[in-house]
Amino acid sequence: MRKIAAPGEQFLNAGHFWRCTLQEALNFSAGCAMVVTVNTSIPLEEPASGNISAERKPLEPCSIVIFGASGDLTARKLIPAFYHLCKDKQMPSAFRVIGFARRDKTDESWRNELREELNQFSRTQPVDDAVWKAFARNLFYCRGDLTDAAAYKKLEEMLTSFGSGPLRENLLFYLATQPSQFGEVIEQIHRAGLLHKDGAGWQRIVVEKPFGHDLASAQMLNRELTRYAHEHQVCRIDHYLGKETVQNILMFRFSNSVFERLWNRESVDHVQITVSEKIGVGDRGGYYEEAGALRDMVQNHMLQVLSLIAMEPPVSLAAESVRDEKVKLLKSIRALTPEDAARQVVRGQYFAGTINGQPVPGYRQEPKVKPDSNVETYVALQLLIDNWRWSGVPFYLRTGKNLPMSASEVRIQFRPTPHVLFAAQCGQHLDTNAIALRLQPNEGIYLRFNGKVPGMSLGVRPVRMHFSYDAEFGAYTPEAYERLLLEAIAGDATLFIRRDEVETAWQIVDSIRKGWDGKPLTNREFYAAGTWGPVASDDLLAQSGHVWHEPQMIK
């Protein structure tokens, strides 16, 4: 335990308990706080209590086909993920990875390109040449247009050349393409005899967000995805669900009785979920003009985190049990009328400002953005959950571009103590307890509570106990795609989004967007780049006597 300075936190004194004045106490201990941290020089003393994944059957040999393999996603995320799975000996005993794209390449030229890009995008450096060579022998390239039936016939012949067993029958199709092309690809692989609802082996389809742009388009997309496949064969990826700290939400809640018994309206005052980005839209202006922060972040990432934070305990860890509870939670969110949305939702857009001492342009000055655009780069909302556990507890969500820092954090703010003893002396200045789950960066969990400041006076101030992933387990943290690809091969759907989850989330988002149609942004909805959002966002919480808590950079 060590003393550190804690900027922005005020010293609190419990009045006249030991005949010391507040000013005396301030003079004695201003600027001093205590944070309990992990001593990284001490080795782990506690062995693992158990490994649930140890009961999983060995992964079956399979072939993975990446459609749109010449795009950034393959080089930046997919191939590095497969490489690290090989390095960690997590891949099946036999596998093949086929890249399908229009560009004219050979197996060898594609392998060489990927090797060069791995130098930039691998999370571990340097790249292990022995691991790469063993991995690269399983990389193949199939040139073809997504609409050309002959190209799929060529793909089928390539798969058949691997043998008649699992490498031909167990197939994972990764659609790294535009959503508008999903239907075409699925129909073509079905016609080529590669995709079946029932039959030998297994076939699965992996798709990336966006899963539509509203409820109607999402329903249409879901019909296309399940035209030739069962719902359990479809893996909808939200990379947030692959993050270690997001997965740890369920572990934190349901393997620790000390916290779960506080996780309800009796103890919790409100919950804040912040996903802030320090960067602007950059060269994604064209995409952002169609999406905006609500569709880009709230519909998927933020509602997924909310569902994990607030869901009821599942009856088991089986995929459908977990996903059932997430859907129940989303359906429990109180529907927003246009009048409700006007009170409970705030949008914003950044104008020119300064970040790290450097000037940055406003959203309307970004490339491919309309000069009079009303698209939101920031959104904050208050959601209410109508169930026994959370009735009356507001959940505040906010996300935005060009904010002061990039961070994702969930803060559980507990109710204040009764107005006696220390609370009676300090009044509203006595800090309330909180648990914060830091999803990124500096992943970890900290508990905020009040403690006595050392000294002759009875000084009270907030202190933190901090659990850091890096300090406790070392710097090894797999990328989200590594875990998600492994789960797709294994056929475990827990970390993938089910059809009804997608559609329920779109119902929430659509009800908000209806209230914005045709309405221009007001002055209180603009914010300078490098600040924490528009004034209207503070007004949203002030209605209930709450304030935003900015994520704190704890190392």
Where are the model-predicted features located?
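Cationic, amphipathic, low-complexity segments that mediate targeting or membrane/lipid association
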Residues: 6-9
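Secretory/organelle targeting and membrane-embedding segments
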Residues: 34-207, 211-555
